[in-house]
């Protein structure tokens, strides 16, 4: 298909700006082991209940681990572990991932360089994540691209959750650009669902997250190996 008149780009964070598996799975395994009190079989069941295939090690792209919030993960883990303390688990997830040095984000490319070039082209840029708003800001500051962003929204920002249109609608309202001029870039069907429900001009899938190519190809206008190929895909390189 041809490239529409794109004036803004809304990026997912984990699996799109950052390699999902290398960044997040070590932490989820650590907290699952903690909640299960070292019971490896129980920890495996908890991870499986939230989307991790115990045989292949792959994630279900629409699972809680791949596309949900810490609250969703905690509710499922509490049910499997029969501990009845979902709020406490969610708080532990938030505090663990929010602690300095707890995770080592692995960017898929030079984020400051890429977003800086896109900004120089006059594009408005945003991040919509199922992580918290505060965590998204920390990542943007840590990798020196916060000043290139016009908008950041998290699952706790009050604009709903993917695949609903709320996050995208809020982005469009914030930057004053109609949805048909927006490209949404993400790694899961939920990201593509947000693009479609929000009326985005382009839905672009990337393979640095939980979803295989065939799954994204059924939903996206384009599927890229990573956002490192985005400028070429948009005709900007």
Map each language-model feature to its residues.
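Residues that cap or flank secondary-structure elements
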Residues: 65, 106-107, 128, 159-160, ...
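N-terminal helical cap/lid subdomain that shapes the substrate entry/recognition surface
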Residues: 3-121
